[in-house]
């Protein structure tokens, strides 16, 4: 039975209802600082923690609950005679409920504050109390999440107590929270790219209907700190997002963020099927659609500019899962909303692409994101690309890095006319891209040509210029073919494998 509760919260959502309920059941309430003031001003009978400890707050509030008279009351095991004898001798009363939420370090670490100001939001007393209460969960109910208040109130109403299953779950939530909280602090202080221990701080954003396939359960977690496009987007219309939707949206958004020009990316199964740049939003959508008017069906379309009404009217002519853009004209949004299932996503954050992580069985691979497009760019053939061809070549390299290896992209006039990817050898990828393109002008490859066959195949289709990393022991074979066929070729010095 709960006779004594300690309440100290930063987030005061729902705390008055909880406190008044406890008061109605003759529970003695102890509180601190701002929480004490808030409860008292709202008519709750509350005891200042200083009356319990006999010691005032000190060090600008850094020390207020760190006291044996508090922690002894939390940690004492009620059916341990020695424990109860000791706290009675020391004048310590048991504390049966601890209601605490922490200083918002997750939020403050991203604000425009000095280092020392951010450090002040590292909570010490709160974590100490909730860890103690969680350890002694059989005797102490610990609440750290405002969403749990109602359930606990209902259990007490029905059973006059909180059952052991609920107590254990609430205790588990404490250590789950503290793992994330400590991880955020650790990463803030260490500032290491590859620390000895990899600690990640993510919070569940939403439960998903299922994962990649219907038989796979899934949920979506987002970083507790920082601003990221796949964390801070806003859904303006449509059904709930799925696991595959979020994965696809991430790649589509990263692709359009590569370009300063107006850009559009159509994507299906995590692979671009149409990418284009141009002068207007209508132009780039039309070009992206024309890249592959079959595969775009049921896919995702992303833009790096605001979507207008005319483009929206074209978008709803086909079945799409998602349209994502930095913003939408009001009349464009009204058009898109006529498709009630179409997910319309407003995403203002630019792609950060800091680290890539891949889970393997028993480990996590961590690497820098592929942010370097070119390095030692040089023309290696007798013929040089024209300025227009060079622009298309650079465009092609920005696209090919988002296509699964082996990857080839064929480009014409700022549009990816043919995309070949996910092949186990490069010539198959080249044939796929060239066949889809039909009449492309330039070709981009994510990695070097191991033989001269890709250059030979490119010549058959009238390709005028090629861009690739170079570095093969048989580079001269490809260079020779290009010189014989009148093709210019550029080496970049940077490979873009994607697996």
Curated annotation (Swiss-Prot):
Sections of the chain in a coiled coil: none
Keywords: Hydrolase, Multifunctional enzyme, Purine biosynthesis, Transferase
Keyword Transferase: yes
Top-rank lineage group of the source organism: Bacteria
Protein's pathway: Purine metabolism; IMP biosynthesis via de novo pathway; 5-formamido-1-(5-phospho-D-ribosyl)imidazole-4-carboxamide from 5-amino-1-(5-phospho-D-ribosyl)imidazole-4-carboxamide (10-formyl THF route): step 1/1; Purine metabolism; IMP biosynthesis via de novo pathway; IMP from 5-formamido-1-(5-phospho-D-ribosyl)imidazole-4-carboxamide: step 1/1
UniProt cross-references to PROSITE patterns, sorted A to Z: MGS
Cross-referenced Pfam families: AICARFT_IMPCHas (PF01808), MGS (PF02142)
A GO MF label: IMP cyclohydrolase activity
One GO term of the biological process aspect: 'de novo' IMP biosynthetic process
InterPro entries: AICAR_Tfase_dup_dom_sf (IPR024051), Cytidine_deaminase-like (IPR016193), MGS-like_dom (IPR011607), MGS-like_dom_sf (IPR036914), PurH-like (IPR002695)
Keyword Aminoacyl-tRNA synthetase: no
Domain MGS-like: 1-144
GO CC entries: cytosol
Matches recorded under Gene3D superfamilies: 3.40.140.20, Methylglyoxal synthase-like domain (3.40.50.1380)
HAMAP family: PurH (MF_00139)
Matching PANTHER family: BIFUNCTIONAL PURINE BIOSYNTHESIS PROTEIN ATIC, BIFUNCTIONAL PURINE BIOSYNTHESIS PROTEIN PURH
Family: Belongs to the PurH family.
Record remark on domains: The IMP cyclohydrolase activity resides in the N-terminal region.
Protein name: Bifunctional purine biosynthesis protein PurH
Phylogenetic lineage: Bacteria, Bacillati, Bacillota, Clostridia, Eubacteriales
